């Protein structure tokens, strides 16, 4: 989607207006590319906002496999002049046609098999893709031996779980929905994670805002503890972690190195204003400081 940001140019007044390609898929792909992967971005594009968005996407080190849609691409405007991100406007999203959905589905499956991993992310808010698309994507990609990592909210996540993803990234408040109560103890968190595993997840990473992420795979569990920073923004940190996971899985790295790198990618994003951004050199330095604490 097209992101329009208003920032203060100087303390004396005046505004600075930025146009960026945005959306979870864009931020994940950007971080994966920074870490040396060759991501392929699949999605819809169209309308006036799409005409502005395409050249911004083409500036990224990402292969584009975009499906033209009769409806416009999503766009939103937010104001950062106060130092906080304040939403001003967001365009409505119209449902794509059956033909457009079919084209995106087949394009995504082919790209995943070519790339070696599928990172399945949330759509533009309000985008009405049929729920079964998510489970079908996971199942078809997995059937060909390609790993899948997902970062989705319910009910899309429930559909994806039916396909058996290798790894699910979820935050603690969304995880709480699986046991209808807060995941405020390790016991309750493990109970909620078990629901995801029983539904099809191979492993689960739970992000917990300022608390260390928790990782569960099989009978093993860890806290994932990156360096702690006091001032920064958590916006985009989860997407940077997702990009790190996808890049490391595509490269076939060992599990612990994958976890350390993805946690470092999220920590690096915390220090920056740009979503899904970070320096590979900084991430590699921070990864050496990440602790994996067995639970």
Annotated model-derived regions:
Residues 1-12:
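Positively charged, low-complexity intrinsically disordered leader regions
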Residues 132-219:
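Conserved phosphate/ATP/ADP-binding segment of small-molecule kinases
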């Amino acid at each position: 989607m097209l992101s329009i940001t208003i920032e203060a140019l100087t303390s004396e007044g005046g505004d600075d207006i930025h146009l960026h390609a945005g959306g979870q898929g864009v931020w994940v792909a950007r971080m994966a590319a920074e870490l040396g992967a060759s991501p392929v971005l699949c999605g819809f594009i169209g309308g006036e906002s799409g005409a502005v968005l395409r050249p911004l996407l083409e500036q990224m080190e990402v292969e584009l496999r975009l499906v033209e849609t009769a409806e416009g691409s999503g766009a939103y405007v937010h104001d950062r002049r106060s130092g906080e991100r304040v939403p001003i406007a967001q365009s409505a999203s119209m449902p794509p046609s059956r033909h457009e959905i079919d084209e995106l589905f087949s394009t995504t499956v082919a790209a995943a098999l070519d790339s070696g991993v599928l990172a399945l992310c949330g759509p533009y808010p309000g985008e009405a893709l049929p729920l079964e698309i998510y489970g079908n994507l996971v199942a078809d990609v997995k059937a060909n031996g390609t790993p899948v990592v997902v970062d989705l909210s319910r009910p899309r996540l429930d559909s994806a779980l039916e396909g058996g993803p290798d790894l699910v990234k979820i935050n603690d408040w969304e995880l709480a929905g699986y046991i209808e109560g807060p995941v405020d103890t390790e016991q309750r968190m493990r109970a909620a994670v078990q629901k995801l595993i029983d539904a099809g997840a191979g492993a689960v990473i739970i992000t917990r805002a300022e608390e260390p992420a928790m990782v569960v795979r099989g009978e093993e569990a860890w806290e994932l503890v990156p360096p702690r920073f006091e001032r920064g923004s958590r916006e985009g940190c989860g997407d940077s972690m997702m990009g790190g996971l996808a890049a490391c899985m595509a490269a076939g790295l060992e599990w612990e190195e994958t976890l350390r790198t993805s946690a470092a990618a999220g920590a690096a994003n915390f220090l920056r204003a740009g979503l899904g951004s970070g320096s590979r050199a900084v991430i590699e330095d921070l990864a050496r400081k990440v602790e994996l604490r067995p639970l």
